Amino acid sequence: MTNFGRLRVHIAPVGFQFRRVTEPLVKMLADKVYLVTYRENDDARKFVDQVRKELQKYPHVEEQTIYLNLWDLYECLEKFRQIVFNEKQNHVFVNVSTGTKITSIAGMLSCMLWKATPYYAPVAYPKTNEAQPPPTEIVEDPEVLPVYDINKPKRESLQVLDILNKAGGRMRKAQLISELERAGVIRLKDESIVKFTKAAKHSQLRVILDPMELEWNYVKVESNGRRSEVSLTEQGITALRIFGTP
């Protein structure tokens, strides 16, 4: 635990080098770890068991196992986001040196998006003339990696995506305005104005939708006479999966 009462929580995908999971937990004084693996009984099971056996030496480290598709970027991002949000009162670290390449990518993206700390555990291999891996890897001190901010969609943009998704991916503008009014996104901002006109509501909606359509390609706006509809694009669906509901 840190001086400020925050737990040191680790997300650690389990690969075939179990010490790259356990050594950083010990050296970085972990309080809790989420072990990420594919299935309960797959080829990596024995390595998960090795990690658990090693952690028995450190009973203060709480362990929780998470099962997910390690080759699905979006599933990994969704789960990592959920963990970071659930542990937002703590300091979350992500091991990007273990698991699959996809979990490493998801780990780095998660850290940049949701302010966790990534680290890499290098392995020192002894010099040998034989082309075979050593029986036991020597894990050096983990290296904390730099992270940079990623521009995330605004909250109201995510609300629009969520509303459209729940409506089946398409909605008339008038219906969307009603939903956004209900959510408090479209509202009368000047109390000196007595009447909140239809034109004013459409103007506020346009401010939200224009960048979503023209810059991000999250939605498509189609007009047919006086009837206008807003539909969710594949890019918008992907954004909702990555960034989550507001």
Located regions from the model:
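Long, low-complexity, Lys/Arg-enriched
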Residues: M1-H91, I105-P246
